[in-house]
Amino acid sequence: MARRRKGRPVNGVILIDKPTGITSNDTLQKVKRIYFAEKAGHTGALDPLATGMLPICLGEATKFSQFLLDSDKRYRVVAKLGERTNTSDSDGEVVQTREVKVDRGQLERCIAKFRGTTDQIPSMFSALKYQGRPLYEYAREGIEVPRESRKITVYSIELLRFEGHEVEMEVHCSKALTFVRLPTILGEMLGCGAHVTYLRRTGVSNYPYENMVTIEDLEALLEQAHREERAPRELLDPLLMPMDSAVQDLPEVNMIPELADHVLHGQPVQVFGAPQDGIVRMTSGDERLFIGVGHIDDDGRVAPKRLVVFRDEEEK
């Protein structure tokens, strides 16, 4: 007898507007429950303090979540000058207070120094994991663990507001930037200390900001479906982005269904017009059905790397 699945095979990406004070994993579990999804995974944790865009992959889309984890991000951050906390953010205790003698010109010159590529050691109060646990859990227990420096790139950083002791900035960066570190470093550059009071992720890859939904939105739709005696999927599934939206930045290789069938059985194929190397997004037929991610092998063929598993309708 086949083992009964826990959940349904729903596939796609939902853009959640994560609230503050909740972990990314807690958010993931709530979405998985609401969708009654068989599989779910997020695409890079946000610190509990942070709000904003958290793409959650459901079903087969989880196979491609790494591409979103590696993608560029956009943030809006507010820092308070003159106070340093033991966590580098407003959740911690103030451990040092200093006078703020900073003008806008000095601030803009310091901010400009963040642009470009540098090495950064992650903060102990970040959501990055060490041996399966977020760093901030170790930090709250007074334990410091080794962290390797990582290359980070800040493509742009703009000063939006400087009022009193508050500084608001907008940042476009690579995946590795640990945001609680940025205001801390800025504060030391200015000689007054600083910590994060507000952090919001406004963008991941090219996903539209306006497509975000809250957990409350999803719960309301679930309640509506129960009230109207409808299948929840009728109201919830239209909010999903296609699973290949996670790999939209990859070059597409479209192939005839006969070749796609070979690929889906693990065989590399020769496709006219394919790139000479690199990772590609594979589609089949005139309808451009997404079948997975491949790579160009040493013989110039398109070889499967991550494939979508298609199920018969009766399984759904």
UniProtKB/Swiss-Prot annotation:
CDD domains, sorted: PseudoU_synth_EcTruB, PUA_TruB_bacterial
Active site: 47
Gene Ontology molecular function terms on file: RNA binding; tRNA pseudouridine(55) synthase activity
Keyword Cell membrane listed: no
UniProtKB keywords: Isomerase, tRNA processing
Alphabetical GO biological process terms: mRNA pseudouridine synthesis; tRNA pseudouridine synthesis
Alphabetical list of InterPro entries matching this protein: PsdUridine_synth_cat_dom_sf (IPR020103), PsdUridine_synth_N (IPR002501), PUA-like_sf (IPR015947), PUA_sf (IPR036974), tRNA_psdUridine_synth_TruB (IPR014780), tRNA_sdUridine_synth_fam1_C (IPR015240), TruB_C (IPR032819)
Enzyme Commission numbers on file: 5.4.99.25
Function of the molecule: Responsible for synthesis of pseudouridine from uracil-55 in the psi GC loop of transfer RNAs.
HAMAP family reported in the protein's UniProt record: TruB_bact (MF_01080)
Family classification: Belongs to the pseudouridine synthase TruB family. Type 1 subfamily.
Protein name: tRNA pseudouridine synthase B
